Design a protein with these regions (language model features):
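Catalytic beta/alpha-barrel core
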Residues: 4-13, 34, 82-83
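N-terminal active-site wall of soluble small-molecule enzyme domains
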Residues: 1
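Catalytic alpha/beta core domains of metabolic enzymes, predominantly
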Residues: 25-174
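Metal-dependent catalytic core segments for phosphate chemistry
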Residues: 22
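Short, charged, surface-exposed secondary-structure boundary motifs
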Residues: 13-19, 40
Length: 178
């Protein structure tokens, strides 16, 4: 049940031309990757330019802005120590400039090639949520990750009266399992 989500459109010419007619004028949700024919962007400014073209192109083709999930593309922190903040700055800029658009990412890319990835992933998830990220591709069976996400959502002001946090506590997601 629910609405289908198309993974994904980008500014890579062949992909854009193939996917746009599939989503144009529909109620489908679409992941919009900040990627172009020039390759992976490295800076926030590069991501914003791509996001702008993708979002405006989709909206112009009757895709509801609430159905657009921009993925600014997480790159491994082990290859360049600026990649974490470039991604986080991109999330903040996209959510500020394009009201109603969602942001999401494949979180574990940040820790690729590093030991004890779960700690990096959990901390990066919290940082990204604080900057406005509202969708994550994660392992939902990682109880500690789920607890971190629920807590971050609460601290970011997205959990009225801490209801989700309290529900997660009662369900044993946060705290000692029952």
């Amino acid at each position: 049940k629910g609405t289908a989500m198309i993974n994904s459109i980008s500014l890579e010419e062949d992909r854009y031309d193939a996917v746009l007619p599939v989503v144009a004028g529909t109620d489908l949700k679409i992941v919009a990757l900040c990627m172009s024919s020039d390759g992976m962007p490295e800076t926030c400014d590069q991501r914003l330019k791509i996001a702008d073209k993708l979002i405006n192109g989709l909206v112009k083709n009757n895709v509801d802005i609430d159905n657009i999930y921009v993925d600014p593309l997480v790159q491994p922190i082990g290859t360049d120590d600026t990649y974490g903040f470039e991604f986080l700055d991109s999330v903040a800029a996209i959510t500020t400039q394009f009201k109603g658009v969602h942001t999401m990412c494949g979180l574990s890319n940040i820790s690729f090639g590093l030991p004890e990835r779960k700690y990096i992933n959990r901390n990066f998830a919290v940082m990204a949520i604080a900057r406005g990220l509202d969708g994550l591709i994660i392992n939902p069976l990682d109880r500690d990750m789920m607890g971190s996400i629920v807590t971050a959502e609460m601290l970011a002001g997205r959990d009225e009266f801490c209801a989700e946090y309290l529900q997660a506590f009662r369900a044993g997601i946060i705290g000692n399992p029952k």
